[in-house]
């Protein structure tokens, strides 16, 4: 049997959050207050925004795409992979026979860059379930174009791949 500790989270009332310590001092946070899931929390999939000639990787595109194939292989071996790319047919040729295609979904969408952490949906959990927030990335203070990347989440939700 684990221990329960009340813990206010982000100004939440003590009753809104419980921390359970297990036998080996592992812990699990149970909360009804809005929060971002931990990086180790269960997830429905991972998004990769695929490199192409219009991204910063042009000078070493072949090498970077090979790296993305290796990343895609590892992800799709374990869970759903969403690949965002303006060229899904080309990406399919690159990964066919090298990646578990049963776990791969594609979203055809123009992109500026590959950094999904900058433009991907933000998941918010609360008592009502899961919400996806459509974060607007400003390209590091307008240093880089991000207009196409800022459309990815909306298009993924509209096409029901997310």
Predicted regions and their residues:
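Intrinsic, low-complexity polybasic segments
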Residues: 7-10
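The feature marks the mature, well-folded catalytic cores of soluble enzymes
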Residues: 21-162
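Universal eukaryotic N-terminal targeting presequences
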Residues: 1-2, 25
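Aromatic (phenylalanine/tyrosine) cluster motif
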Residues: 3-4, 21
